[in-house]
Swiss-Prot record:
Protease subunit of a proteasome-like degradation complex believed to be a general protein degrading machinery. Its EC number is 3.4.25.2. One of its GO terms (cellular component) is HslUV protease complex. This is ATP-dependent protease subunit HslV. The active site is at T10. It is found in: Cytoplasm. SUPFAM superfamilies: N-terminal nucleophile aminohydrolases (Ntn hydrolases). One of its GO terms (biological process) is proteolysis involved in protein catabolic process. CDD domains: protease_HslV (cd01913). It catalyses: ATP-dependent cleavage of peptide bonds with broad specificity. Keywords: Allosteric enzyme, Cytoplasm, Hydrolase, Metal-binding, Protease, Sodium, Threonine protease.
């Protein structure tokens, strides 16, 4: 990709509050400083809605990673942590996969994980993770709301946090899509 902005031009947020796990994404697809689409779907549910995933980066690369993750999840009997580690190893070592320009967040009832092409599988603290150009805005808002707004649900926190990120990040929009683990 010739433009580093295209790699990070989105916001993906995943959080767990009580027993509710939710992932949210904005709908904007940008290339450089141009908005190409405002209603993109960057999320997927896997394993009969037991696992949720979202990507930031190249669309084709993100979709390829979704497919690879689904295969790993089937191979490892829906064990998300093992599947994520195996995907990260392949992503880092495979000549083709190594060139993929994307990041992922995946989650289930036990884990929220960030996966990168460097082979990283990071389980963030505080049950909240975010990636993309608006990720730090969404992460900050979600952590603050989780600390001080005990009456909000995970879905309400995700929506408020994503809207704050969309207000601040020009590469994210207010067309928020969410998925839950069931």
């Amino acid at each position: 990709m010739s433009d580093n902005l295209a790699l990070h031009g989105t916001t993906i947020l995943c959080l767990k509050k009580n027993e509710e796990i939710i992932i949210a994404a904005d709908g904007q697809v940008s290339h450089g400083n141009t908005v190409l689409k405002s209603t993109a779907r960057k999320l997927r549910t896997i394993a009969n809605n037991k696992i949720i995933a979202g990507f930031a980066g190249s669309t084709a690369d993100g979709l390829a990673l979704f497919e690879k993750l689904e295969v790993k999840i089937e191979q490892h009997k829906h064990n998300l942590l093992r599947s994520a580690v195996e995907l990260a190893k392949d992503w880092r070592n495979d000549k083709y996969l190594r060139r993929l320009e994307a990041m992922m967040i995946v989650g289930d009832r036990s884990h929220i994980l960030i996966l990168t092409g460097n082979g990283d599988v990071v389980e963030p603290e505080n049950n909240v993770a975010a990636i993309g150009s608006g990720g730090l805005f969404a992460l900050s808002a979600a952590r603050a709301l989780m600390s001080y707004e005990n009456n909000l649900t995970a879905e309400e926190i995700a929506l408020k946090s994503m809207n704050i990120a969309a207000d601040l990040c020009v590469f994210s929009n207010h067309n928020i899509i969410m998925e839950k683990v069931v």
